[in-house]
A protein has these predicted regions:
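Charged- and aromatic-enriched interaction segments used to assemble
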Residues: 101-246
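Assembly/oligomerization scaffold segments
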Residues: 1-122
């Protein structure tokens, strides 16, 4: 069975909040009540939330206006390396105040910096006589990789997986943002390895990937799931009960 962990088992190494022009920063570990980071192979960039219990009115004094950068680093027990990344704050929830104290609770919503860069530029370019996977690499490097001089906050990310596509093609990208351009290219790609056209472009906590769904199915499973009808106990057919379970 896989090891079950409580949220408190996670070691928080860094929660550093920078203001919009990087002229000021503050450590918010002490006021972070909850955080979550979401990975999805059908979503291009990481997303997440931070729940802050603010008893020092940081939202006014810093201030937090929804254009900040958050540096996150945490460590899972038993893992050799920490998980870290820098993200853009794009939304702040309504504030909730307690009845018996002066603290206030609110949520900061964040996304990867590449999502912001994606909104700022367009790709209007022709690629000639090259595989689609190479075109995707060029779009990623030229339009999404952070080239800011604030390298300690925005270390450049990598396209860790770029599954090779078949045949040389000539394709004109018609003025799309980078994520749209990669989707446009993905729809025209066929894998060398499995003759599949199910390419997807996504980010996980390690970096970005351009790969097919068939490649996922060839990987070793992380968990084994057993499924049985929800209203029948196979050990005792006369008993009704939920039998979905996961073995890890």
């Amino acid at each position: 069975m896989g090891e079950y962990r409580q949220p408190r088992d996670i070691e928080i190494v860094k929660f550093m909040l920078w203001n919009y022009d990087f002229s000021k920063k503050t450590d918010i570990r002490a006021i972070t009540a909850e955080f979550a980071i979401f990975e999805d192979i059908q979503v291009n960039a990481l997303q997440g939330t931070l729940v802050l219990y603010d008893a020092v009115d940081l939202i006014q004094e810093f201030p937090i206006i929804g254009e900040e950068t958050i540096e996150i680093e945490f460590r899972v027990p038993g893992e050799k390396t920490s998980i870290k990344g820098s993200f853009r704050i794009y939304k702040i929830s309504n504030r909730q105040r307690g009845k018996t104290d002066t603290g206030q609770l609110y949520v900061l919503y964040f996304v990867s910096n590449e999502y912001y860069k994606n909104l700022q530029v367009k790709v209007k370019k022709s690629f000639r006589d090259m595989p689609v996977s190479k075109m995707v690499e060029k779009v990623f490097e030229n339009y999404l990789v952070e080239k800011s001089n604030i390298s300690n906050v925005w270390p450049p990310k990598k396209l860790l997986t770029n599954e090779e596509s078949a045949t040389q093609q000539t394709i004109v990208i018609p003025n799309l943002n980078p994520f749209g351009a990669i989707k446009f290219l993905a729809d025209r790609a066929e894998s060398v390895d499995n003759k599949s056209s199910t390419y997807t472009f996504y980010e996980d906590h390690n970096g970005f990937h351009f790969t097919t769904f068939e490649s996922f199915m060839e990987q070793e499973p992380v968990h084994t799931y057993n499924y049985e009808p929800s209203n029948i106990d196979t050990k005792n057919p006369n008993t009704v009960g939920t039998k979905d379970r996961r073995d890890a």
